[in-house]
Amino acid sequence: MNDERVTARVVPVLERAANGDVVLNERSGASEDFSFMLNDVPGQFFFLGVVPRDQELATAAPNHSPNFFVDEKALIVGVRALAMATVNYLAASKTD
């Protein structure tokens, strides 16, 4: 699962990228194979919430449903978060 040191460094970056709109959940591997990579390489896995703000999460269609709907504004946040996390990681690796 997520490396604690990487997570401690990434969460503040995600909070800046999402203007503080970050929810920390219990650990979950869901059905992602990414967790296997984290056995060998320290990293951090996170979910990007894409359900529209005016829709209850409980009523949202799941990923593989033909009714799945993505609030495309969330994609901008996701790209910003990944870019900022990458820049943060590269800057920190120069000083480590």
Q: Where are the model-predicted features located?
A:
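Metal-dependent amide/peptide-bond hydrolase catalytic core
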Residues: 1-96
